[in-house]
Design a protein with these regions (language model features):
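Acidic/polar-rich alpha-helix caps and helix-coil junctions
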Residues: 1-57, 79-198
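Short, cationic low-complexity segments
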Residues: 62-75, 79, 84
Length: 198
C-alpha cells in the first residue's frame, strides 16, 4: 500500500535477514563479482552476449548514450574522499572523428570491457536504504536511522554519520537521499521514485 512504511521495514528486514543474499565485503566487490555478487536481488542476466552492444546498449541508452556525465549537483553530494567515488567514476580520453581528443567522465561501475555488464536492478544495500527511509517516516529515533545508514557507509569505508549532525528530520531525509545517490546512483532508476516521495 502507498505509504505503508511499517511493511517496508518488515520486508527490508526479511531480505536483510535472508541467508540467500548478503552484503559484499567492499563496495568494489559488487561490481567486480558482477552476476556472481551475493548482493544482487534482481538483475538481467546476459552472460557472454554475442555482441557487446546487446548488453551494453541498454546501459548506454539509460545513462545518456555516452553523452551525459555526472552533473556538478550530483558530484556535490559525492565527495572524492568517499571510497565509492573511485569505484563509481573514471575519466577516459576519447578521440572524435576529426581526430580531436577530449576527456569525459564515465560511470565506471557499469562498464566491463568483456561486455558482461550486469544491471543492478536491486541489491541488499538498497534494502538498508529503504529501511532507513521508512524508519524516519515512522518516527523512529534519529540515532536508529543513522545506525542503519552507517551499515551501508561502513561497508563502503565511508566516514560514519553522527546523529548529532541532523538537527531535524528533514536534514536526515536529505542525507538519506544523498546516501542513495552515493550508493546506488545510476544503477536502477530507484532515485526517481525516491525523489517523488521526497
Amino acid at each position: 500500500a502507498d505509504g505503508d512504511y511499517s511493511e517496508a521495514i518488515r520486508l527490508a528486514n526479511e531480505v536483510i535477514g535472508s541467508a540467500e543474499f548478503g552484503m559484499e565485503d567492499t563496495y568494489a566487490d559488487i561490481f567486480q563479482h558482477g552476476y556472481d555478487s551475493k548482493e544482487l536481488l534482481v538483475t538481467r542476466f546476459m552472460k557472454n552476449p554475442p555482441a557487446m552492444d546487446d548488453n551494453v546498449g541498454s546501459l548506454f541508452k539509460m545513462f545518456g548514450g555516452g553523452t551525459y556525465q555526472p552533473s556538478s549537483a550530483y558530484l556535490a553530494v559525492f565527495p572524492e574522499e568517499d571510497p565509492r567515488y573511485e569505484v563509481t567514476f573514471d575519466s577516459l580520453e576519447f578521440t572524435n572523428l576529426n581526430g580531436e581528443k577530449y576527456k569525459r567522465q564515465i560511470w565506471k561501475k557499469h562498464y566491463v570491457s568483456t561486455g558482461d555488464c550486469p544491471m543492478y536492478y536491486m541489491r541488499v544495500a538498497q534494502m538498508y536504504l529503504i529501511k532507513a527511509e521508512a524508519m524516519l517516516r515512522t518516527d523512529s529515533p534519529v540515532k536508529d536511522v543513522v545506525d542503519v545508514l552507517n551499515i551501508v557507509r561502513n561497508r563502503a569505508g565511508a566516514t560514519p554519520l553522527k546523529a548529532s549532525d541532523y538537527p531535524d528530520r528533514e536534514s536526515l531525509m536529505n542525507e538519506i537521499f544523498n546516501e542513495n545517490l552515493r550508493e546506488i546512483g545510476m544503477e536502477n532508476g530507484a532515485l526517481y521514485y525516491l525523489a517523488v516521495r521526497m
